[in-house]
A protein has these predicted regions:
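Short acidic-hydrophobic catalytic motif
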Residues: 1-170
Length: 170
């Protein structure tokens, strides 16, 4: 819950495309620490949201995530379960960050007075704005008529940010 500023109208796809273009280089000189999930591990947030890591089947090297959020806005309860792999992150990278209608109002008015918020670039194109009962703008990543944009943002983009903060980025 860092209050991350919005990036692009297309979520984080420009970052994904930049990484793909630059390529990934394996540094064989640096030691790598591997973590093994031996049993389900769940982290629960104060509002009922959670992230669960599941162990892979014997001989399998995949990581399965079960992510849920529960916001007191039109976003409401959302949940996705997926195996972490390239296509899942590309799908999730289309998700924009989100905020409530009240936060958007603040950013567009009083927030312009303060140096830490005046240039964050909040628009209805690059952020999902949720009112109490309905979205202010058009949500993306629909499944069965319901937007899962906020939970995909949490599952993919917030997870990448958290993992990047691990010791030595590994």
């Amino acid at each position: 819950d860092s209050g991350d500023p919005p990036l692009f109208e297309v979520g984080s796809m420009p970052i994904v495309e930049g990484i793909r273009k630059a390529g990934i280089v394996v540094d064989k000189e640096r030691p790598v620490t591997f973590l093994t999930v031996k049993e389900p591990v769940t982290i629960v947030g104060p509002n009922g949201g959670f992230l669960t890591y599941y162990p892979a089947a014997a001989g399998d090297r995949k990581l399965t995530l079960d992510v849920a959020i529960d916001f007191p806005t039109a976003i409401g309860k959302q949940r996705v379960v997926f195996d972490v792999w390239d296509d899942a992150f590309v799908h999730g990278a289309h998700a924009r960050t989100n905020c409530s209608q009240a936060v958007m109002f603040y950013m567009k008015t009083i927030g312009k007075l303060f140096a830490d918020t005046r240039n964050l670039g909040y628009t209805k194109d690059n952020i999902l704005v949720a009112g109490k009962r309905a979205y202010v703008n058009t949500p993306k990543l629909l499944h069965d008529g319901k937007s899962l944009e906020a939970v995909w943002h949490r599952a993919c983009l917030d997870l990448i940010a958290a993992l990047s903060l691990l010791d030595k980025g590994r």
